[in-house]
């Protein structure tokens, strides 16, 4: 019986196997690799590697099915193996045999057979690589001559066929590099025959051949020539690879043996070339040598004798065990429909001949006839080999009868009902008699439109329910005048479009002005989407230029360009040196002196015309020895005194002396908007005395008078400025006192007695200045530069020093100094007057900028700055004949203290700029003295702390008088213009001796900031899950009927109550020199899954023609699963120094509990944090994903009884699973939970329920700059999607145990199980078998692994907005902080048990016995 069943199975398998097509779907690539050191890439040279794509679908292909790939113009496969497997993911789904065409067919083929690994639920696809060599000719056989025309040199299209499907690819073939006019040779190895086909073509004669001899022979006797496989002919040309393309007969004589072959020919026409080819068998296919005869005479040419020898080292196919065997190729005609090549069975140890058969089909002709009937019949009239067979196809056709009826439709329909068992078909014509309809349209949740028609009986009312998906939505965003955003939804009817109108406020606008090359102005507006910023670009033409030329004190010319903003005017200032001056003095009739200056343009000469009144006349009367009187007039130049000397006879005389002095005080003040300038000067202690004794040896009288007029020019500068934004105060006060002392002596030595006069006066000067500045700006930068110059020989200079200090750093400093000397040379006569004028320009520019980019910023700064200034004026003059010496020294100093304190809160960038300008002071003065100043000395005490000391010692005796002065203040920040203040005339008479020492020090000190930060993250997640299930039992009882299929349905309800809670606490501590910051946060989330349902359907098949009684009960039990998830994570970041982070590794563990199995997960993580030195804001993110799977077990019981002795196959499937869940989440952050169950299709008999969940959480913490007074910490939590992939690999083992103590072990690659039970014993009567018990156990080997990787990259943008001293610094730099890689491993042993029992009772009758015996003999 077993043999009979085996034969039946084989018969059914062969009967169901079929030929399929379309498996190969593409040629992905076709590349060449040089397998034999060939000179060019020819199509016939191995190896061409063809990569083909294939696809096998288990729904259309079955094990045993065959498919064939035909490869035209392919000579052979160059692989060493005989077949190739179509493999996907390591599984073989088909095996393909190689059939090389060689010299037998013009194509090669690949015949494939599907194996048992392909099931209906599998679709496999992949690629296969085939090493091949193409056939482009090489012999005179019909196969080679046909294939010699397949390709040409260059680009070709290679096409393969899989049934009706054509696969093509373009490829480039290179032409032969051998000269076609010479002799041509080639050899090809044929693996199936283990022989080489060698070709020899005679050299070319363009006008034809008169005669010739050609052939080849073995050189050493190691090559055997097969004289039975020889082709001789003449070819009309050769192809691109030097192979014959035609073969025609001609006159020749052949001589052939196993050692050589040759022919002698005559009279070959022009355009043709003789050739000869034969099969040879070298003893070594890889190396052999042939000698060639080459004698020929071309028409109208001389006889040529050029024999040659070639050594062949060609390509050999590695066909093991095939050398030295006689191989015979035969052709046989068969009844198949296609041509094939096959190898007959061959045993090397017994058989000596290996036969290759070329199977060619018998040609057939088909005749089609018809008749009235049901079935199509085929009959074949066979024919012997060599004739044509006839196939007669008798096709049936049916007659029809027509039936007409009414129906509720709107059109007339005609339906033909074909009768499968009779030759008369029925044509049903339905005439419309429609019912009225009521149509209802409604929305539903699906994405497509559904129409349901409820048709009532004839003459009733039909209902049409149209279900439409929700309308698509078109969202339009537009601007409006309000300051807030709003959304309006307009809902249309079904099949319409809903509109969502989003109204956004207008974007803010940023305007940028720039120059361009055009002569006109233009404005371009760039509008962005809502919540963006619009840009307005104003392009202005370049400003016009105004050129001003002025004189300056340098000896060279210079040009300065001042560029203003658009729509302004640019200024070009050309500074030229002063012109030389020519002075001319002349008398005039007026009583006063005047000076006229004629100024010319630059590079000219100025003229000064001095007009003086006539000199006064001094009359002197003196005695002389004469007795008469006489008068003498002495005339001097301008500004002199003419003398009239009267000589009288000797008489007595007397003289008088007059001295006069005066005191005066000067003061001046100037007032400007938003600033105050106070300056006062007082001069005290002015006195003079005169003591002039006169004596003479002889009586005499004399008169002496002294008149002194002093005038001087003094240039000085003083300015105070203030700026105010929000609140600003600048105050300044100066106090000056002066003490001057001077002594003047006169003497006369014209007589024997000494006459002298002494005048002494003194005064003191004390100057003091103080300033106070208060401002809310976070940075103040002050720079003052004072300068004045005189066109004569006087100058004024000052030294300013600004020192600013903060608790952490010195931010800025500016020091400038200048100390000139001035010498005034007077005329020879005394007294003298020198006039000069000075115009000085001073500009002070103050700029403060604050940039804040944060939601909330609080800054406090308390810097202090001091300002010291000293100025000196020195003048030196001398006169002759007097040797008097006068020195002048003036000095003043003041200090400024700046203590700003502010608090700033901003939500956007803030920029504050303070421009301030002060310029122009003019003084007019005159001086008449002789003075000297000691040379000052300056030394640098230390270069490291920038300390300088200036020492000088002066002795001053001076007299200064000023007639008028003006001071001018100008503002350029939209102020009130310029203010000119006049000062009254004043005079200073002083005598002073002083030692002055000035020390300027600048010390830059920085207090390092030490910050200590500690971040602790302790998330704790506890999860618990419990579930229980209940199911219903169903049974079906069928008796005494024919059953084809029974459908069982069962519905179970799975109630589940899962809860998950998560607690996360975060604490942060920052310690810095400005204070401590503690911040903390907590996170709690709870998720619960309330209920889900499972729908199960089962199909029981029974195929029997006899009575069957079947009862089935099933009990589905879902294991009680408790899952506990504990997650602990600790992350610590310590910051002990600025901008330096260190981290400690953290550990991550998870423990799952499922029955008695343990699932563990251990993660070791090491975090690396790198920051740049300027990073003060750190963002740390962490992300965790958790998942778990749970499996269920199925317990069932089946019992059945058959009242038949025929086989009955019963298979029960439980296949479909669906799950739905409700979630309730409470969280301060964002927690996502998901639950899903995967349905397993039929026919597996086990149920696999998977429950997975994932949580996603991202935390971001921002730390503010540690350099500011008040640090700020911000924490944010956002949701970050993460994809996590887990792969579970299982190796279950299934064991079945029977009551006869037999056992079987089956390895199954998956958890799919099927059991087929067959009971049949027709020879026993009234046999009862209740002992069949099957136990199925499944053990999952703990070799499962899950690998997951998580890479987290965080980028932080830092902003430093600390306030140090008088300025603000900002820095922004992206920095990659953290990169984490985590690897997890799971080990999860699970146990699933299946138990079943069955019992059967057989009571066969005589009829059943008879049927069984008949079936037995039939099989």
From Swiss-Prot:
Protein name: Agglutinin-like protein 5
A Pfam family of this chain: Candida_ALS_N
Organism: Candida albicans (Yeast)
Glycan-linked positions: 665, 919, 1301, 1326
Disulfide bond annotation, renumbered to this chain: 73-150, 96-112, 205-298, 227-256
Originating gene: ALS5
Residues with lipid group (GPI-anchor amidated serine): 1398
GO CC field: cell surface; extracellular vesicle; hyphal cell wall; plasma membrane; side of membrane; yeast-form cell wall
Membrane-protein topology: Lipid-anchor; GPI-anchor
Sequence ranges of Polar residues compositional bias: 1012-1022, 1079-1093, 1138-1160
GO biological process: cell adhesion involved in multi-species biofilm formation; cell adhesion involved in single-species biofilm formation; cell-cell adhesion; hyphal growth; single-species biofilm formation on inanimate substrate
């Amino acid at each position: 019986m077993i043999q009979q069943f085996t034969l039946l199975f084989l018969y059914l398998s062969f009967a169901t196997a079929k030929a399929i097509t379309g498996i190969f779907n593409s040629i992905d690539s076709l590349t060449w690799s040089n397998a034999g050191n060939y000179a060019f890439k020819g199509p016939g040279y191995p190896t061409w590697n063809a990569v083909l794509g294939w696809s096998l679908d288990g729904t259309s292909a079955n094990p045993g099915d065959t498919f064939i790939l035909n490869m035209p113009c392919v000579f052979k496969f160059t692989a060493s193996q005989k077949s190739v497997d179509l493999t996907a993911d390591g599984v073989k789904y088909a095996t393909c045999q190689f059939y090389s065409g060689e010299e037998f067919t013009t194509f090669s083929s690949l015949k494939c057979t599907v194996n048992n690994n392909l099931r209906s639920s599998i679709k496999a696809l992949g690629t296969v690589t085939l090493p091949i060599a193409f056939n482009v000719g090489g012999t005179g056989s019909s196969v080679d001559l046909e294939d010699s025309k397949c390709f040409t040199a260059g680009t070709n299209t290679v096409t393969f066929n899989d049934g009706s499907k054509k696969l093509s690819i373009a490829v480039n073939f290179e032409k032969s590099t051998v000269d076609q006019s010479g002799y041509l040779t080639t050899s090809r190895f044929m693996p199936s025959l283990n022989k080489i086909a060698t070709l020899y073509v005679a050299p070319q004669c363009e006008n034809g051949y008169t005669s010739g001899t050609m052939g080849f022979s073995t050189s050493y006797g190691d090559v055997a020539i097969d004289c039975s496989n020889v082709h001789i002919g003449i070819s009309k040309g050769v192809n691109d690879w030097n192979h014959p393309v035609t073969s025609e007969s001609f006159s020749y004589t052949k001589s052939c043996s196993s050692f050589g072959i040759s022919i002698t020919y005559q009279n070959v026409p022009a355009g043709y070339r003789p050739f000869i080819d034969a099969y040879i068998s070298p003893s070594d296919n890889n190396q052999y040598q042939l000698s060639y005869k080459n004698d020929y005479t071309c028409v109208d040419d001389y006889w040529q004798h050029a024999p040659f020898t070639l050594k062949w080292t060609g390509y050999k196919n590695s066909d093991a065990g095939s050398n030295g065997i006689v191989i015979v190729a035969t052709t046989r005609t068969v009844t198949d429909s296609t041509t094939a090549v096959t190898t007959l069975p061959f045993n090397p140890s017994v058989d000596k001949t290996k036969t290759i058969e070329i199977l060619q089909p018998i040609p057939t002709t088909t005749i089609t006839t018809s008749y009235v009937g049901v079935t199509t019949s085929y009959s074949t009239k066979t024919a012997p080999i060599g004739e044509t067979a006839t196939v007669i196809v008798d096709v049936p056709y049916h007659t029809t009868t027509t039936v007409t009826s009414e129906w509720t439709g709107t059109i007339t329909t005609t339906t033909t009902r074909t009768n499968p068992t009779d030759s008369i078909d029925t044509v049903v014509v339905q005439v419309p008699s429609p019912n009225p309809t009521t149509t209802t349209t409604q929305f539903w949740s699906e994405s497509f439109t559904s129409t349901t028609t409820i048709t009532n009986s004839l003459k009733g009312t039909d209902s049409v329910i149209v279900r439409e998906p929700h309308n698509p939505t078109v969202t339009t965003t537009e601007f409006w005048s309000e300051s807030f955003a709003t959304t309006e939804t307009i809902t249309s009817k079904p099949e319409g479009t809903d509109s969502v109108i989003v109204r956004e406020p207008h974007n803010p606008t940023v305007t940028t002005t720039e120059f361009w090359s055009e002569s006109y102005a233009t404005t371009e507006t760039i509008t962005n989407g809502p919540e963006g910023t619009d840009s307005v670009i104003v392009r202005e033409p370049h400003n016009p230029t105004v050129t001003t030329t002025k004189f300056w004190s340098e000896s060279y010319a210079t040009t300065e360009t001042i560029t203003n903003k658009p729509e302004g005017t640019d200024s070009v200032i050309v500074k030229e040196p002063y012109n030389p001056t020519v002075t001319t003095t002349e008398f005039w009739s007026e009583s006063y002196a005047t000076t006229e200056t004629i100024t010319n343009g630059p590079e000219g000469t100025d003229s000064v015309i001095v007009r003086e009144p006539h000199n006064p006349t001094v009359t002197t009367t003196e005695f002389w020895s004469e007795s008469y009187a006489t008068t003498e007039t002495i005339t001097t130049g301008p500004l002199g005194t003419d003398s009239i000397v009267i000589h009288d006879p000797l008489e007595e005389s007397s003289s008088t002396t007059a001295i006069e002095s005066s005191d005066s005080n000067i003061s001046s003040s100037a007032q400007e908007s938003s600033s105050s300038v106070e300056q006062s000067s007082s001069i005290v202690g002015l006195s003079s005395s005169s003591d002039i004794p006169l004596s003479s040896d002889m009586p005499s009288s004399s008169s002496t008078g002294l008149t002194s007029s002093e005038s001087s020019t003094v240039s000085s500068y003083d300015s105070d400025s203030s700026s105010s934004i929000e609140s600003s105060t600048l105050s300044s006060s100066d106090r000056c006192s002066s003490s001057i002392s001077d002594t003047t002596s006169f003497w006369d030595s014209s007589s024997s007695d000494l006459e002298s006069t002494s005048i002494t006066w003194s005064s003191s000067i004390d100057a003091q200045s103080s300033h106070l500045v208060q401002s809310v700006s976070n940075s103040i930068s002050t720079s003052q530069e004072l300068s004045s110059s005189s066109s004569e020989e006087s100058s004024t200079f000052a030294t300013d020093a600004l020192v600013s200090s903060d608790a952490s750093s010195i931010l800025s400093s500016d020091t400038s100094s200048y100390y000139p000397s001035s010498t005034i040379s007077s005329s020879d006569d005394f007294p003298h007057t020198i006039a000069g004028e000075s115009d000085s320009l001073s500009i002070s520019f103050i700029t403060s900028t604050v940039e804040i980019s944060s939601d909330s910023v609080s800054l406090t700064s308390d810097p202090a700055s001091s300002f010291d200034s000293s100025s000196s004026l020195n003048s030196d003059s001398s006169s002759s004949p007097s040797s008097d010496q006068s020195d002048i020294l003036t000095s003043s100093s003041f200090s400024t203290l700046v203590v700003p304190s502010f608090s700033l809160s901003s939500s956007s960038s803030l920029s504050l700029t303070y421009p301030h300008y002060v310029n122009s002071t003019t003084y007019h003065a005159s001086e008449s003295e002789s003075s000297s100043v000691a040379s000052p000395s300056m030394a640098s005490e230390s270069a490291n702390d920038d300390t300088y000391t200036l020492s000088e010692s002066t002795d001053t005796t001076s007299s200064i008088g000023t007639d008028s002065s003006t001071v001018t203040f100008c503002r350029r920040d939209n102020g009130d213009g310029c203010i000119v203040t006049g000062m009254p005339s004043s005079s200073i008479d002083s005598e002073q001796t002083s030692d002055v020492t000035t020390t300027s020090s600048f010390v830059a000190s920085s207090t390092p900031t030490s910050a200590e930060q500690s971040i602790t993250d302790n998330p704790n997640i506890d999860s618990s899950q419990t579930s229980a299930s209940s199911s219903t039992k169903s049974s079906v009882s069928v008796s005494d009927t024919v059953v084809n299929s029974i459908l069982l349905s069962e519905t179970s309800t799975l109630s589940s109550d899962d809860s998950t809670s998560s607690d996360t606490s975060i604490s942060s501590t920052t310690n810095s020199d400005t204070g401590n910051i503690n911040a903390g946060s907590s996170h709690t989330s709870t998720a619960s899954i309330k209920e889900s349902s499972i729908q199960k359907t089962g199909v029981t098949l029974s195929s029997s023609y006899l009575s069957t009684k079947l009862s089935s009960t099933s009990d589905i039990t879902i294991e009680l699963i408790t899952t506990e998830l504990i997650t602990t994570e600790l992350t610590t970041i310590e910051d002990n120094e600025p901008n330096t982070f260190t981290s400690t590794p953290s550990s991550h563990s998870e423990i799952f509990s499922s029955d008695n199995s343990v699932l563990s997960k251990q993660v070791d993580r090491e975090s690396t944090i790198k920051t740049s030195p300027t990073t003060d804001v750190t963002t740390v993110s962490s992300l965790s994903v958790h998942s778990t799977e749970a499996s269920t077990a199925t317990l069932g019981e089946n019992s059945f009884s058959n009242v038949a002795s025929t086989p009955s196959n019963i298979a029960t499937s439980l296949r479909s699973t669906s799950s739905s869940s409700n979630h309730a989440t409470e969280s301060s952050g964002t927690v996502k939970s998901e639950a899903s169950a995967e349905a397993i299709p039929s026919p597996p008999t086990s149920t696999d329920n998977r429950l997975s969940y994932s949580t996603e959480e991202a935390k971001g913490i921002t730390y503010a700059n540690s350099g500011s007074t008040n640090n700020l910490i911000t924490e944010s939590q956002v949701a970050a999607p993460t994809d996590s992939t887990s792969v579970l690999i299982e190796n279950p083992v299934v064991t079945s145990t029977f009551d006869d103590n037999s056992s079987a072990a089956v390895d199954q690659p998956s958890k799919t199980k099927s059991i087929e039970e067959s009971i049949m014993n027709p020879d026993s009567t009234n046999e009862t078998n209740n002992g069949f018990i099957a136990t199925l156990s499944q053990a999952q080997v703990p070799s499962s692994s899950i690998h997951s990787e998580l890479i987290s990259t965080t980028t932080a943008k830092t902003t430093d907005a600390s306030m140090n001293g008088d300025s603000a610094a900002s820095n922004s730099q992206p920095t990659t902080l953290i990169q984490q890689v985590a690897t997890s491993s799971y080990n999860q042993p699970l146990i699933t048990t299946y138990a079943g029992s069955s019992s059967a009772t057989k009571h066969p009758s005589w009829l059943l016995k008879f049927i069984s015996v008949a079936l037995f003999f039939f099989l």
